[in-house]
């Protein structure tokens, strides 16, 4: 059984000048960013995320979301968000997998932050091959993922909390943000389950 004390918690959330926020400097404009766990090539976090994504263990998303949600609620950094939006799966991949691995994580954050979890605004329009076994450079150079917005007017004047499972290069989140930033007077913050150094 997995003990909470075995997990490599980083929890960058209480200050803006953190490694995750810095990872997006000069790439996209975000308000703030936070992640809960370190993701290493071999380790507990990798096992958890793999079980969540490929083994159907959606309770892992709830577990991480509940734990991190309490921390984020107590932090002053994310009190002004308006809604939570997940990085979407392509419909074909979601049908194949049967679920989006971010759903339980997002719903748990929604419960603790008391903000709506919205899944029908950001749409993935191209299916990408799994990134799981690619090296960091391969992930960055091969990122041709495309997104679109279903209802851009609904994002006007909103502060969006964009969520994902793992930040490796940040390329997928960057693609999402570029699309979201088309909306008028929008602000974006990012929260993920894990971060790869």
Give the location of each predicted region.
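Glycine-rich phosphate/pyrophosphate-handling loop used in enzymes and phosphotransfer proteins
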Residues: 1-197
């Amino acid at each position: 059984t997995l003990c909470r004390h075995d997990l490599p918690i980083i929890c960058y959330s209480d200050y803006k000048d953190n490694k995750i926020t810095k990872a997006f400097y000069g790439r996209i404009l975000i308000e703030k960013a936070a992640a809960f766990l370190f993701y290493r090539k071999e380790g507990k976090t990798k096992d958890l995320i793999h079980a969540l994504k490929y083994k159907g263990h959606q309770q892992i998303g709830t577990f991480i979301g509940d734990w991190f949600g309490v921390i984020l609620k107590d932090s002053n950094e994310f009190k002004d968000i308006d809604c939570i939006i997940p990085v979407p799966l392509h419909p074909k991949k979601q049908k194949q997998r049967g679920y989006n691995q971010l759903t339980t994580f997002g719903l748990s954050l929604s419960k603790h932050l008391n903000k709506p979890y919205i899944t029908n605004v950001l749409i993935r329009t191209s299916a990408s091959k799994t990134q799981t076994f690619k090296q960091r450079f391969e992930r960055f150079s091969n990122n041709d993922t495309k997104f679109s917005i279903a209802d851009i007017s609904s994002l006007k004047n909103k502060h969006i909390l964009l969520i994902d499972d793992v930040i490796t290069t940040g390329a997928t989140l960057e693609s999402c943000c570029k699309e979201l930033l088309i909306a008028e007077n929008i602000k974006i913050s990012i929260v993920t389950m894990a971060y790869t150094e």
